[in-house]
Amino acid sequence: MTGRGKGGKGLGKGGAKRHRKVLRDNIQGITKPAIRRLARRGGVKRISSLIYEETRGVLKVFLENVIRDAVTYTEHAKIPTVTAMDVVYALKRQGRTLYGFGG
């Protein structure tokens, strides 16, 4: 055993994957009912059919900006994993302070 504790197999310690799944159309995973639930939480009663695609586009841009900033913090710290604090700092930098995740 090479110092891996009781796990034995050493899962997650392998090399690069041979076949990486191509990521496309994942934005469609934000379903119509999910957008409807978010709108309901915001106090919306009736929703136009054009809203769903528009919401997906806005959400995609927002997440791209937050993730870009969070990854920048992670790379600066020279660590391989994006932490919750990286995301908190990225949101704070964009003027959207988030409480409850440390710091």
Curated annotation (Swiss-Prot):
The modification N6-acetyl-N6-methyllysine is found at residues 6, 13. The keyword Nucleus applies. The keyword Disulfide bond does not apply. Core component of nucleosome. Nucleosomes wrap and compact DNA into chromatin, limiting DNA accessibility to the cellular machineries which require DNA as a template. Histones thereby play a central role in transcription regulation, DNA repair, DNA replication and chromosomal stability. DNA accessibility is regulated via a complex set of post-translational modifications of histones, also called histone code, and nucleosome remodeling. The nucleosome is a histone octamer containing two molecules each of H2A, H2B, H3 and H4 assembled in one H3-H4 heterotetramer and two H2A-H2B heterodimers. The octamer wraps approximately 147 bp of DNA. Belongs to the histone H4 family. Residues 1-20 are annotated as: Disordered. Keywords: Acetylation, Chromosome, DNA-binding, Methylation, Nucleosome core, Nucleus. One of its GO terms (cellular component) is nucleus. SUPFAM superfamilies: Histone-fold. It is found in: Nucleus; Chromosome. Its main location: nucleus. PROSITE patterns: HISTONE_H4. Residues 17-21 bind DNA. Residues 1-14 have a biased composition (Gly residues). GO terms for molecular function: DNA binding; protein heterodimerization activity; structural constituent of chromatin. PANTHER family: HISTONE H4. This is Histone H4.
